[in-house]
From Swiss-Prot:
It comes from Stenotrophomonas maltophilia (strain K279a). It comes from the Bacteria. One of its GO terms (cellular component) is cytoplasm. One of its GO terms (molecular function) is ATP binding. This is Nucleoside diphosphate kinase. It is an enzyme of class 2 (transferase). The gene is ndk. Major role in the synthesis of nucleoside triphosphates other than ATP. The ATP gamma phosphate is transferred to the NDP beta phosphate via a ping-pong mechanism, using a phosphorylated active-site intermediate. Keywords: ATP-binding, Cytoplasm, Kinase, Magnesium, Metal-binding, Nucleotide metabolism, Nucleotide-binding, Phosphoprotein, Transferase. Homotetramer. One of its GO terms (biological process) is CTP biosynthetic process. Its main location: cytoplasm. Its cofactor is Mg(2+). Pfam families: NDK. Belongs to the NDK family.
Length: 141
């Protein structure tokens, strides 16, 4: 087992539903610890920068618009195999395909408004965490 960190973003749709606490409880039950967190309204520049890898994809503009449509809750999570553990909690990107009991099955509205983001690899997690948090803001516990 490897101790890892991953980035998690509770997206505007889930924040609007007031389910941040319910989602955090799932993280904790799965053994993931919040080691950094911030609640904020993303600027267009922040959203475009974060999702720059998708810039040429047809859904890029809609994704950016959605991510700036309301506040988000951003957290770095730490735990054994955190990337996979978090992605398992999230479920499939399309909530219609997500297993019952996953965050997206329970809280997401559509493939676009899918409740949460999760890093897809340890390498990307490090990049994504550094995008939103200074090293001094991430504290193991």
């Amino acid at each position: 087992m490897a101790l890892e960190r991953t980035l998690s973003i509770i997206k505007p749709d889930a924040v609007a539903k007031n389910v941040i606490g319910e989602i955090y409880a799932r993280f904790e039950k799965a053994g993931l610890k919040v080691v950094a967190a911030k609640y904020k309204q993303l600027s267009r520049r922040e959203a475009e920068g974060f999702y720059a890898v998708h810039r040429e994809r047809p859904f890029f503009n809609a994704l950016v618009e959605f991510m700036i449509s309301g506040p988000v809750m951003i957290q770095a999570l730490e735990g054994e195999n955190a990337v996979l553990a978090h992605r398992d909690l999230l479920g499939a990107t399309n909530p219609k395909e997500a297993a019952p009991g996953t965050i997206r099955a329970d809280f997401a509205e559509s493939i676009d408004a899918n409740a949460a983001h999760g890093s897809d690899s340890v390498e990307n997690a490090a990049i994504e965490i550094a995008y939103f948090f200074a090293a001094t803001e991430v504290v193991s516990r």
